[in-house]
């Protein structure tokens, strides 16, 4: 099967098998350099998808909004969305809260995944948009959890 005939899930599986221990993504954080291997991205994607399905009871066709700067977890969230059958709604971090509210009111996401830098915005949107049943913080486990209504990546 050629590259053109493969879907995203097939490519994710193939790459995690073929390049398992090779570094797929890396970035500098305030805690130092952070790297994800291909198998690490695949594992994190599957864990997030499992969490979305088993804990948040998302259904195929539900929408997952992502508000975050570019980071390795962003890619894992997109893959998790595909694995769980959700529709990904990537949002530009430069949009105003009113622009975000307008977009999300229209697409009605059930979950918002957000980096810590945009946490306050996500909480505002959760209060304003009835379809949003959960906000998930994408940052590292050492990041402070702001309140009990916010979930964190597994």
Regions inferred by a protein language model and the residue ranges of each:
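Acyl-group handling in specialized metabolite and lipid biosynthesis
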Residues: 1-4, 34
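Aromatic/hydrophobic pocket-lining residues that form π-stacking "cages" and hydrophobic walls in ligand
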Residues: 12, 77, 122
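Conserved AMP-binding/adenylate-forming core of the ANL superfamily
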Residues: 21-59, 65-71, 75-79, 96-101, ...
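Structural core segment of the AMP-binding/adenylate-forming
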Residues: 83-154
């Amino acid at each position: 099967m050629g590259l053109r005939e493969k879907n995203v899930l097939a490519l994710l599986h193939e790459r995690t098998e073929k390049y398992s221990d090779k570094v797929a993504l890396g970035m500098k954080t305030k805690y130092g350099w952070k790297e994800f291997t291909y198998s690490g991205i695949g594992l994190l994607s599957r864990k997030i998808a499992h969490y979305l399905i088993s804990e948040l009871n998302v259904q195929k066709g539900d929408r997952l909004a992502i508000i975050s700067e570019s980071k390795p977890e962003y890619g894992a969230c997109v893959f998790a969305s595909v694995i769980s059958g959700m529709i990904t709604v990537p949002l530009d971090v430069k949009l105003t809260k009113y622009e975000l509210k307008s977009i999300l009111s229209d697409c009605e996401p059930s979950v918002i995944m957000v980096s810590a830098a945009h946490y306050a915005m996500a909480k505002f949107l959760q209060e304003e948009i009835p379809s949003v049943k959960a906000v998930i913080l994408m940052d590292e486990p050492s990041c402070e959890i702001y309140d009990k209504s916010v979930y964190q990546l597994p």
